[in-house]
Amino acid sequence: MATKKSGGSSCNGRDSRGRRLGVKKFGSELVIPGNIIIRQRGTKYHPGKNVGIGRDHTIFSKIAGVVSFRRKAEGRVFVDVLPESVSASLS
């Protein structure tokens, strides 16, 4: 017979890793086609000009240019990619 009782097993002690969501390219950053701009759950940010939205609501660039964020009157935030020639004339 053992003189020491065995320790019990625990049901706790595990957790899942974070999902690495959020803005990956900020306003006025240069992007190329296919660059991920935002990873999100749901449409916190909406796709604007020259960007696409993936099946998991990831917003990505369709053209080379500069990232721009704009807010509409109803409160929605849209993400655009402006061509470099247009963004140069704005600044």
Curated annotation (Swiss-Prot):
Residues 1-20 are annotated as: Disordered. InterPro entries: Ribosomal_bL27, Ribosomal_bL27_CS. PROSITE patterns: RIBOSOMAL_L27. GO terms for cellular component: cytosolic large ribosomal subunit. Keywords: Ribonucleoprotein, Ribosomal protein. One of its GO terms (molecular function) is structural constituent of ribosome. Pfam families: Ribosomal_L27. GO terms for biological process: translation. Residues 1-13 have a biased composition (Polar residues). The keyword Ribonucleoprotein applies. Belongs to the bacterial ribosomal protein bL27 family. HAMAP family: Ribosomal_bL27 (MF_00539). This is Large ribosomal subunit protein bL27. The gene is rpmA.
